[in-house]
Amino acid sequence: FQRLLYQFCAAIVVLTAHGFFLALAARLLGDRGPQYDGRLALNPFRHAEPVGALVMIATQLGWVRPLTLDPDVLVGKRIGPLLVTLCALAGSLALGWCCWQLRPVVFFSFGGGSGSTTLIGLLETTARASLAFVLINLIPVLPLSAGHFWLGIAPPVGAVMNRYRLPIALGLA
């Protein structure tokens, strides 16, 4: 039960952070759409897709709700969606690294008691989930983050993938 609780908490943190990083990268690269859609927030309900969240809790491999990007307004035009994805994945990787680096700080701050064991377990689970999330989201298919690549490079392919996003998501699950 404890492992499932850790994975639930890690999924909330990783999905929320990654969704926020996607929206922030899109905004910094010139697309205001995610900001207007309310995605530039740390609200997990804005970012988590139900199927992706359940898969994330069960296997530590998941995805966030797709972000609507306009490649024409992004810096880099056609490669803009790829830049947004890479920035967000780098942010998620940094989150995992930070969680891993906080373990000794927590241990020495709490003196190795049960509180530190719980928090260290949560940090380790979040770090592992973040790494697994980044690795799975490097696969260039929608609904995964790297699937945004197709929206800029080959819009017809991206449109087809977007249309069949749910069957693809269920296949990934």
Predicted segments, located by residue:
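Hydrophobic transmembrane alpha-helices and their immediate loop junctions
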Residues: 1-173
